[in-house]
Amino acid sequence: MTRAGLSPLAWLDEVETQRRAAGLRRSLRARPPVGTVLDLASNDYLGLSQHPRVIDGGVAALRTWGAGATGSRLVTGNTELHEQFEDALASFVGADSALVFSSGYTANLGAVVALSGPGSLLVSDAYTHASLVDACRLSRARVVVTPHNDVAAVARALATRDEERAVVVTDSVFSADGDLAPLRELHDACRRHGALMIVDEAHGLGVRGDRGRGLLDEVGLAGAPDVVMTTTLSKALGSQGGVVLGPAAVRDHLIDAARPFIFDTGLAPAAVGAAHAALQVLVEEPWRAQRVLDHATTLAQICGVADVPSSAVVSVILGEPEVALAAAMGCLERGVRVGCFRPPTVPAGTSRLRLTARASLSDDEMALAREVLTDVLSRA
């Protein structure tokens, strides 16, 4: 059969039909202006994306440095503001140094690939974020994926390896369920077997630890010489961008070896200025971290979730994709936006509503959440 005349994209129609049949078709919906819909879906955990000081920080940087970074950080994309923010964030979390990337995704890609490579072993939790999964795939290292939070499996992979170098990668707080990694136990395994540990604190920074310093701080691993922390600026800090924090030698190596850092345009100054201002607010208002957890506990009680949340994330498992999607749309029709996680983001049969608490939720907003969620979930 000749292929002449066939569209090279004809296969997309079949794929879309399959997605629709499985209830997995995704679409974009424009976010309305602030205040028109109650937001229980975003990752703006501390409510800082709309904070006046954070907005002012972004605007001031915009006026001083311009709209874009204009180049990679090794060319023209590095400013005093980037370096000041790196110093401030490193000091806050107890790290020796920090390096800002254009996103949390590229920070993970840069760190994992540059710190592993051919001839090394990567051990990854089965539930790590997609950015860590992709980093492992790009690394050209041998990759072992271990069952979720299975420290014994991690230790076995490290103990039986032939490779001299090994790296264990994990989230500190897992994004779909909001549960915590056993960081202390994982670190003990790494130390016994001479492995580096890379921890993504995207959902831990600003919520866990003393004054919101993250789960690494909470378990006494802040600044450990064999731990590298990555995080995003798009969640608790209400901006965007990513950071790798750790020993100064790691920062120096990433500047020379992390391809997303070398070849990507630097993070826009406005995003850096906003994140820096948000960090200052967090330092001055540490109550925000506990407020997030308090609101998450209330949301879990409203939804009938038995376990007390360990983070801002409240996961309400409903089973099939169409059930979760219908519940999410029912909430939106009543003025409440919630997240809807379906495969492949979560395993088949565990489609869910993913609610996120915010420190800035008012009593009236919590009352609306109770009214809408109670009604919608009673029908799900």
From Swiss-Prot:
Family in the record: Belongs to the class-II pyridoxal-phosphate-dependent aminotransferase family. BioF subfamily.
Keywords assigned by UniProt, alphabetized: Acyltransferase, Biotin biosynthesis, Pyridoxal phosphate, Transferase
Chain's role: Catalyzes the decarboxylative condensation of pimeloyl-[acyl-carrier protein] and L-alanine to produce 8-amino-7-oxononanoate (AON), [acyl-carrier protein], and carbon dioxide.
Protein name, as recorded: 8-amino-7-oxononanoate synthase
Description of how the protein assembles with itself and partners: Homodimer.
Known pathway: Cofactor biosynthesis; biotin biosynthesis
Protease is among the record's keywords: no
Gene Ontology BP terms: biotin biosynthetic process
Domain of life: Bacteria
Enzyme class, first EC level, given as a word: transferase
Residues given in the record as pyridoxal 5'-phosphate binding sites: G104, Y105, S175, D200, E201, A202, H203, T232, L233, S234, K235
PROSITE patterns given in the database record: AA_TRANSFER_CLASS_2 (PS00599)
UniProt-annotated binding residues for substrate: R26, H129, T345
Entry cofactors: pyridoxal 5'-phosphate
Reactions this protein catalyses: 6-carboxyhexanoyl-[ACP] + L-alanine + H(+) = (8S)-8-amino-7-oxononanoate + holo-[ACP] + CO2
E.C. numbers: 2.3.1.47
One protein family per Pfam: Aminotran_1_2
Keyword Acyltransferase: yes
GO MF annotations in UniProt: 8-amino-7-oxononanoate synthase activity; pyridoxal phosphate binding
Sites bearing N6-(pyridoxal phosphate)lysine, chain numbering: K235
